[in-house]
Amino acid sequence: MSDANNTAGDANEVNPEKDLSAENLPGQRGQGGEEIRVQRGMFGANNGGDTSGYGGLVRSVRLPGPASRPYGGWFDEVADELEGALEEQGLLPDNAIEKTVVDRGELTFHIEREHLVRVARTLRDDPALRFELCTGVSGVHYPHDKGRELHAVYHLRSITHNRLIRLEVSAPDGDPHIPSLVSVYPTNDWHERETYDFFGIVFDDHPALTRIMMPDDWQGFPQRKDYPLGGIPVEYKGAQIPAPDQRRSYS
């Protein structure tokens, strides 16, 4: 009976290497972090004939702020090893890492763009880190995040240590350049082309940065939030389907 109780007790103990439930709880939106805009009305639209009352909604739009030590679980181990490895290369961690975010049980390093390649190579090659795989890059457009409107988010996986982190890099609309990581993670080739195609982020030193989804002569970048609703007519089974901005309105 005693052994059974001990076994049950062991099973119920929290394993800090695997259980980050406290950080994994959804944070309360609008509390803490960095406010980038105030959204009014439902879905940000407040000039319609709303009679529901939702047009009066006011919501603070925030990005997660920097976390404080200890981060929890293995996050501190990764952060310590990364900072130590950068120092060994003569690079001060504070000059390379803009901030470290722990949000919803996930670890994200915000990196100064000029140091992105060195940080990524360190994460890949250091034996205690060994993030061998980058599963892709995602683009994000925050028009109200002044001076850093364009974000590129890299998702790194350590197969050796079974860990997942992110690197996030920002650039202003007026200078949308971020170093390419194809030299470190060759599988990013098409992902960076797609992010360029849809968001207009220019990945410097990419071997062939051309559009991958849209026609070569397409104007603009369709997934940016300032991209106008529009398009071109499409022929389908002999019928012409008008572009979205030319279709009949039923409202």
Swiss-Prot record:
One of its GO terms (molecular function) is NADH:ubiquinone reductase (non-electrogenic) activity. It catalyses: a quinone + NADH + 5 H(+)(in) = a quinol + NAD(+) + 4 H(+)(out). InterPro entries: NADH_DH_suC, NADH_quin_OxRdtase_su_C/D-like, NADH_UbQ_OxRdtase_30kDa_su. It is found in: Cell membrane. Signal peptide: none annotated. Residues 1-34 are annotated as: Disordered. It is an enzyme of class 7 (translocase). It is a peripheral membrane protein. Its main location: membrane. Its EC number is 7.1.1.-. Coiled coil: none annotated. Keywords: Cell membrane, Membrane, NAD, Quinone, Translocase, Transport. NDH-1 shuttles electrons from NADH, via FMN and iron-sulfur (Fe-S) centers, to quinones in the respiratory chain. The immediate electron acceptor for the enzyme in this species is believed to be a menaquinone. Couples the redox reaction to proton translocation (for every two electrons transferred, four hydrogen ions are translocated across the cytoplasmic membrane), and thus conserves the redox energy in a proton gradient. Belongs to the complex I 30 kDa subunit family. PANTHER family: NADH DEHYDROGENASE [UBIQUINONE] IRON-SULFUR PROTEIN 3, MITOCHONDRIAL, NADH DEHYDROGENASE UBIQUINONE IRON-SULFUR PROTEIN 3. NDH-1 is composed of 14 different subunits. Subunits NuoB, C, D, E, F, and G constitute the peripheral sector of the complex. This is NADH-quinone oxidoreductase subunit C.
